[in-house]
Amino acid sequence: MILGTSSRLAHSIRPCSSADRLMWITPDRVFYAGLLGNPSAHVRGAMVIYVALEDLIHVNVAQGGWHTSEVAVVQPYVPHQVACDARHVVALYIEPETVDIARLPGRLATGNGVIDAPEFSAHVRGCHARMIRSGRDFDLRPEDFDPMFFGRNLPRRNIDPRIAQVLDRIKRDPSAPASAEECANMVKLSFSRFLHLFKAEVGVPFRSFRTWRRARSLLHYVNQSRNLAQVALEIGYPDSTHFSHSIRQSYGLKPRDIFAGSRKLRLIGDGLPNAALN
């Protein structure tokens, strides 16, 4: 399939209610169907595919002007703004260090803005409807994500084993104050060599990757009735000011607005990162 062929799960744009809100989180992918809010321009560390759920979506990528479609692709770490005349949208996150960008189909590899992919849009809405109908009886595993939405596994990126070890450490515990120096020592590289190799293998600086994974870990908490200051400390922010600033940079919304819009959001997935389970 991959943004192209028709699907037996195809569904049209339709009205949604709070019962349709869910988020499936895996270590390397996210499927979100829920409230959009009114996000300002922001930068996410994942490739994001926005899909129309109730109405067409409007996207402004890198201040290139507003464009409208059923599907938009935004590459990792590219500033953008998204809007919709309805309340609900779908967003799929693909963590870029897990895929070989050069081997992705053209519109995924090079798309940066709206694309013409009505069959894919209808298929994603069909997958969403199936998850809603199945409720808690739908047994989903991380390895099911790509085949469900794209028809096959996306091509994996080959990462230097030393950098892969660091990536795994950060993903397992994004709240840990792991410095570049510590990680360099862990994999027996000099500090400068580690920073160079990390950027060459992952595509972004170490600090940018760590910042995104910490902000991403917030997704595991958003439907909980928790004190935001406590959440900030749990996921590794030194104080509420840093927390609010980082989350607004990553999502275009204040933390309190994200939590307010997620009260009726159903989360499915593998649970919290290690640190949050302690």
Label the predicted regions.
Residues 1-22, 126-131:
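A short, N-terminal "cap"/entry segment at the start of jelly-roll beta-barrel domains
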Residues 16-109:
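N-terminal regulatory/effector-sensing and dimerization cores
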Residues 31-34, 146-155, 195-203:
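Short, Lys/Arg-enriched N-terminal segment that forms or immediately precedes the first helix
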Residues 104-133:
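Aromatic/histidine-rich interaction motifs
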Residues 117-125, 146-178, 184-187, 208-226:
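A short, Lys/Arg-enriched amphipathic alpha-helix from helix-turn-helix/homeodomain DNA-binding modules
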Residues 177, 181, 200-238, 261-278:
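Terminal helix-turn-helix DNA-binding modules in bacterial transcription factors
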Residues 190-191, 238-239:
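Short coil turns linking two alpha-helices in DNA-binding domains
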Residues 194, 198, 242-243, 247:
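Short hydrophobic/aromatic patch on the recognition helix
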